[in-house]
Structures are given as C-alpha cells and as structure tokens.
C-alpha cells in the first residue's frame, strides 16, 4: 500500500538456484510485512518475480520508468547494500514485480543452513 512498515517483523526465507533462476520460499513469523499481508489477503501463492539490475543508478532509473507507465511501487526496502522494490503488477501478472540490485549480503552464521550440504 506504499505506507512505511511500522514495528519489528520477522520472516524465514529459503532460497535456491535452479539453472539461472532463484526460487525463494518466504514464511512470515511475526509482525506486519508485505508477506503476511499477502497471505491475509490472497492466501498461499506466488508473491513476486524479480528482475535483477545490478547498478543502483540503473535500478532507480528502471523503477522510475516502469512507474511512469502505470505500476506503482507498493513496497521497497533495503537490507545492508541490497535494495529492492515491489511494483503493483498483481492484477496484470498474478504476482508483484520485484526489481532489485541483488547485492551480496551476509547473514549471521546461525541464520544460514544448507541442504543437503554446503556447496
């Protein structure tokens, strides 16, 4: 809805690559966030697809270009150097369209697990 998220929230995420495509499973744990709102409003399903634009200036320009053509940013965030935007394309695509810079970020070791084993 474009409004700032108030308060703390937590979610779990599992990610893997199959070929050149990354798949994420996101489970909200507590607090209000885009993923918990999605589940409340729509139930389980595909939340977003993502386009990676590695350069931040190019990313900002692409988001501005897409937004000028109709789909507005309904959520954006930053985690360390990772910047991402969700465009409201649900009615047209059946999912939100994420654009982000795919910056490499680190997580605390206790938050990282590998299955079946670390590569």
Q: Which residue stretches match the model-derived regions?
A:
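Vicinal oxygen chelate
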Residues: 10-24, 38-57, 60-119
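A cross-kingdom feature marking solvent-exposed beta-strand/loop segments within repeated
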Residues: 1-10, 31-47, 80-83, 107-117
């Amino acid at each position: 809805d474009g409004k700032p998220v108030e308060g703390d929230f937590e979610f779990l995420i599992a990610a893997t690559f199959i070929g050149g495509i990354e798949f994420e499973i996101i489970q909200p744990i507590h607090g209000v966030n885009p993923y918990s709102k999605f589940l409340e409003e729509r139930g389980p399903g595909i939340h977003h697809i993502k386009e990676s634009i590695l350069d931040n200036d190019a990313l900002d320009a692409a988001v501005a270009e897409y937004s000028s053509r109709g789909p507005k940013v309904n959520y954006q965030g930053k985690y360390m150097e990772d910047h991402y935007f969700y465009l409201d394309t649900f009615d047209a695509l059946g999912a939100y369209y994420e654009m982000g810079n795919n910056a490499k970020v680190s997580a605390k070791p206790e938050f990282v697990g590998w299955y079946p084993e670390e590569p």
